[in-house]
């Protein structure tokens, strides 16, 4: 496991096990609506889009304009893409496109 060992604990395991049971987008909306604030969910969604745009080669100013993300957020995501645990890979736009049609993503 390449994740930070400080993150691993029974409560986080329980959270992830719960997430892994979700089967539909609607179930995800319902779960995350109850679990997160709107801002927390928007922030996570924004970071995923920043990662997608960085993978596509977009520059910081374009990403900032398109997503509203700060340069600090963009830098953090870029650092995760380069030096992180590859956590964005399974949910990256490129990976999702290999498994779904674009109309399924929008």
Describe every region a protein language model picked out.
Residues 45-57:
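Short, amphipathic alpha-helical "recognition" segments used to contact nucleic acids or chromatin
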Residues 79-91:
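Short, solvent-exposed alpha-helical "recognition" segments
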């Amino acid at each position: 496991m390449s994740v930070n060992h400080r993150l691993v604990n029974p409560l986080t395991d329980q959270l992830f096990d719960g997430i892994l049971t979700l089967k539909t987008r609607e179930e995800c909306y319902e779960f995350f609506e109850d679990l997160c604030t709107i801002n927390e969910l928007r922030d996570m969604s924004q970071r995923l889009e920043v990662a997608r745009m960085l993978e596509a080669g977009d520059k910081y100013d374009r990403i900032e304009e398109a997503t509203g993300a700060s340069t600090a957020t963009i830098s953090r995501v870029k650092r995760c893409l380069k030096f992180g645990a590859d956590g964005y890979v399974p949910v990256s736009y490129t990976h999702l496109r290999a498994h779904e049609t674009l109309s399924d993503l929008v």
